[in-house]
Amino acid sequence: MAHPSGSGGTSFAPTPTHPHHLSRETSRDELEMAESLRLLNQTHDHQKPRAEATSQEQQQQQQQQQQQQQQQQQQQQQQHAQEDPRSEIYHSLEDAVPIADGPPTPSTAASLQIPNMNYETPNASITGQVCSNCKTTQTPLWRRSPAGETVCNACGLYMKARNQSRPVNLKRNTQTQPTMSVQQSPTPGSTDGSRTCAGNVAGSPRVATYVAADQMAAGTCPGGGRCNGTGGQQGCSGCPAFNNRVSKTAKFALAQANAAPGENRGGSDAASSTSAASASTSAIPACQNCGTTITPLWRRDDAGHIICNACGLYYKLHGTHRPVAMKKQEIKRRKRIVPAADTSSQAPSSVANYSPPQRPSQTPAFEHSVSPDPSTALESREAYTPEPPRGPIAVDFTHYYSNSSVTSNPVALTPTVQPSAPSPRKRSRSATLDPEEPVNPLPHRPNAISAILNPSQTEVDANIDPSLSVPLRTSGGTSPNFTLSPEEKAAKRERLKREAEAMRLELERRQKELEELEND
C-alpha cells in the first residue's frame, strides 16, 4: 500500500497489517518507481490548461474557416448567376446539386478524405434516390418494385427471389466510406477535353477515382437509344446511366457538405483556400480502366478498383482488361418494347402457328385425288379424320345368321354392295363419296400416294371372306336357309381341299418326326 515517505515522495512499501509485525526497508527499485510516477503526475497537471486553451483556439479557427467557405460559395453562386441565368441544372426535383454549364475552373489535383456519413439524417434526401424498403441511399443499381416504388439492388433481388419484402434487419451497416481521389481538368476553357485515363493513376484497392463533372455539359444527351448520361431528353428519367450519374454526383456533394472542415489545422491560409475551392467543385466517379463516367452499373475488378459495366463484363468474359480503344462516348440502350409487326412480315406462315381448318358437316369429294403432286394430296388429307392404326379389318357379324330372301337371279346374290343400300359395317371413307364418281382410279394416272392413303371400297371388300358378307334384303318373304351360289360353292370347295391337303402334309411331317425320335 502506498503511503507518504519521509522525503516527501510516495512510498510503495507495504504497511504492516498487524502491529507486532516489523516493517521492512524500502528497496532502491521501489524508490525509483515512485519518483518517476511523481514526475509524471506533475507533467500531466501542467499540460491540462495548455490543452484546454489549444482546443478553444482550434474551435475558433474551425468556425472562421466555415464562415469563409460559406462566403466564398455565395460569391461563386452570385457570379455564375450574373454570367449565365442557366448556370444551375437540376436533374431531379430532389437533387439540389448545381452542375455548372460553363468551362471548368482550373485547379490542381487534390485528394479529399470523406468522413463518416449518417444516412438517416434529413440531408439524405439530397441524393434523390432512397430505397422505399430499407431507406438506404447507396446501391450499385436502383430497381423498381412490383408496386412501382424505388428500391435498392438488394431489396429488389430479394423481392424477385422470394416474392416478399426484404427484412430491414438484413441491411448492412455501411458507415465507413473509402478514400476517393478527385482529378479535375488541368487546362481551363476546354469543355470537351479528353478525360484523364484512370488506369494510369496509381492507387490502392478500394479507392474510387473521381473526375470533375464540368468536363461534359449537362443536358446534351442525344436520345433515340443513345445515352451519354447527362440527361436532357424525355426518356432520360428512366435511364439507368443518367440515374447512376445523378446519384453518384449527389452522393459526392453530400459527402463534401458533411465533411468536417479544417482537417489540416496546421496549414497556411493559401492551402486552406485551395482545398476549399477544390472541395466546392462537384465530381463524378470514373472507370479505373477506361476513364469513362457513363455507365448504367459500376463494377469492381479483382483488385477492388471501380470499373464501368463494359470493362467489367469484358474482364469477366476474356480475363483481361478491356482495351481503351474500345471506349465509346455514348452507350446504346436496350430496346425492351417490341415494335408493331408489319403486314409484310406476316406473309410467311409458321408451322407452329398453323391450325388446320374445321371439318365440314358433310365430307366433300376428294378433289385432289387426280393431282400428280404428292404434297397437294398430303395437305388435303389433313382436313379429314386420320385413319385408325393398321390391323385386322373390322367386320360386323351381327346379321351373319339373319334370314334373307332367296332369289333366282344369281347376279343379285353377288357380294357387291349397291350404293343405295345402307352398309351395316363401319363406313369407310370411300363409302361417303358421291355415287357419280368412279371408285377405282384410272391406271394411267400417276397418283400412287392418293391410292395408298385412300383405298377404294373394292380393295377393302376384297380382303373380306365372301362367306362373311351381308346378304341383301328384299321386299319379299324371308327364307329359313342360307344358300350360296355355285361359284361360291366351287371356290369354297377348292379352299377346303387345299386346307385338307396342307393338314395331311403337316400330319405326315409330324409322324416322321415321331418315328425318328422313337428310333433314336
From Swiss-Prot:
One of its GO terms (biological process) is cell fate commitment. Residues 168-194, 342-364, 406-418, 475-484 have a biased composition (Polar residues). Disruption phenotype: Impairs the repression of siderophore biosynthesis and utilization genes in the presence of abundant iron and thus produces siderophores even under iron-replete conditions. It comes from the Eukaryota. Residues 486-520 form a coiled coil. The keyword Zinc-finger applies. Residues 1-86, 168-199, 326-391, 406-447, 467-495 are annotated as: Disordered. Residues 22-31, 486-495 have a biased composition (Basic and acidic residues). The conserved cystein-rich region (CRR) localized between the zinc fingers is also involved in DNA-binding and transcription repressor activity. GATA-type transcription repressor that regulates iron- acquisition genes through specific binding the GATA sequence elements of target promoters. SRE1 targets repressed under iron-replete conditions include genes encoding a number of key iron-regulated factors such as those involved in siderophore biosynthesis NPS6, SIDA2 and ABC6, as well as the high-affinity iron permease FTR1, the catalase CAT1, and the superoxide dismutase SOD1 encoding genes. This is GATA-type transcription factor SRE1. It comes from Cochliobolus heterostrophus (strain C4 / ATCC 48331 / race T). The lineage of its organism: Eukaryota, Fungi, Dikarya, Ascomycota, Pezizomycotina.
